[in-house]
């Protein structure tokens, strides 16, 4: 049902893909009007199996580049009463402490978008140490409980 709704919504957007914030807001509002509840990945992990039958959207953002754009998205979600999961990398385009802090203060989940094996060129021991250090870094902004791998082949 969700995918059918999303597909129909996208088709009505002037027959072209429209990735503007205005259209994103419209999509969120359409899902809210259809009775979907938005939850973070952390919230999903805490659901009982019986609760997983409800209509919900796990809203997750991988912040690979342009962290400032993620803040604008987080503000829109906050205005609509929606919480999402934001996964940040440690690279300069993603790792903007002021943005991470602002998104966390809006009530969104913060997670670590890790790529430690790639950064440490396959050295497992160094990657493990690096992972622990970076996780501690992100935990200064939010009590990180979920992580997701970046798409690098050796992450």
What are these regions (language model features)?
Residues 2-155:
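Catalytic alpha-helical scaffold of carbohydrate-active enzymes acting on polysaccharides/glycoconjugates
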């Amino acid at each position: 049902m969700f995918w059918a709704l999303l597909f129909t919504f996208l088709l009505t957007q002037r027959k072209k893909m429209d990735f503007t914030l205005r259209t994103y807001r419209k999509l969120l509002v359409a899902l809210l009007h259809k009775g979907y509840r938005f939850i973070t990945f952390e919230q999903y992990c805490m659901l009982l199996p019986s609760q997983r039958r409800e209509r919900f959207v796990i809203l997750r953002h991988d912040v690979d580049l342009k962290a400032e754009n993620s803040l604008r998205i987080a503000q829109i979600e906050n205005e609509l009463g929606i919480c999402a999961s934001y996964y940040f990398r440690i690279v300069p385009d993603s790792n903007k402490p002021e943005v991470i802090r602002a998104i966390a203060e809006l009530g969104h989940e913060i997670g670590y978008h890790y790529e430690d094996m790639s950064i440490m060129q396959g050295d497992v021991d160094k990657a493990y140490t690096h992972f622990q250090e970076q996780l501690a870094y992100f935990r200064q902004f939010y009590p990180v409980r979920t992580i997701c791998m970046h798409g690098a082949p050796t992450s």
